[in-house]
Amino acid sequence: MSAAPGTPPPASYVRHPDQPHWGVGQVQSVDGHRVTVNFEHAGKVLINAAVIALEPAFP
C-alpha cells in the first residue's frame, strides 16, 4: 500500500503535536495512514496519520 495523501514521506522529520517531549522524529516508513517514526526521546512509534497530524520539523 502506498502513502495516504497528506502523510509525511519517509526520511522527513516531524514532531508529534501532543507529545513535544518526544523531540524530533524521522519517518522510517509509511503504509497508508500508518507512519513509523523514530523519535529522539521515545524511540520507534507507530502513528495513525488519520488521527494524528504530524507537524513538519527540522533536525
What are the language-model segments listed below?
Residues M1-R15, H21:
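Mixed-charge, Lys/Arg-rich low-complexity intrinsically disordered regions
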Residues P20, E40-A42:
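Glycine-centered tight beta-turn/hairpin loop motif at sheet-sheet or coil-to-beta transitions
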Residues G23-S29:
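Short beta-strand-centered aromatic/proline hotspots
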Residues V35-F39:
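SH3/SH3-like beta-barrel fold
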Residues K44-P59:
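Intrinsically disordered, low-complexity, charged/polar segments
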